[in-house]
Amino acid sequence: SKGYVIKTSSNHFYEITDKVAQRVRITDAQVNVYHDGKKYKLVIRGIDKMLACNKLDGVIESYIDGDFKGYDGTTTFKLANLQVWQQDSPGIIYTNLYKPVVYIYRTSEGYKMKIFGVDDDPIIVKKK
């Protein structure tokens, strides 16, 4: 779905910008990347259409250190790489995950954090 972040086997990161009604849960899916200048498209096995995306540079890949119960609008995230980030956008979600992987990347809206295991759009965060 829109906003989902994919890491390819070549360790490049892409954020899907198209809306996709189809929901496919495939781990290690085959992904082909096509680009024309700065425009990128992904073909993902199991999804019926080519998806527009942004290539992401400087992605921070880590995991939340310990239990993760969700976020409430002002949540602070302590990562295993010793960085601390704070939620900077409204939103509440409840979950129960242990050391979920996170990707943090810069966008025109600021930094976004994608928390794996949470089926929600990436949230806006700021470094503390």
Q: Language-model segments: which ranges?
A:
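Short nucleic-acid-contacting surface segments enriched for D/E, G, S/T with interspersed K/R
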Residues: 20-34, 90-105
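Short alpha-helix capping/helix-loop boundary micro-motifs
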Residues: 13-20, 84-92
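Short, flexible surface segments
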Residues: 2, 10, 26-28, 73, ...
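N-terminal targeting signals for Sec/Tat export/insertion, comprising classic cleavable signal peptides
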Residues: 1-19
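Short, Lys/Arg- and Gly-enriched loop/turn segments at beta-strand edges
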Residues: 38-51, 109-117
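Short aromatic-glycine-enriched beta-strand elements
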Residues: 2-6, 40-41, 72-77, 111
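Structural detector for short beta-strands of small beta-barrel domains
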Residues: 1, 54-71
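Short, low-complexity, Pro/Ser/Thr/Gly-rich segments in the mature regions of secreted, periplasmic
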Residues: 118-128
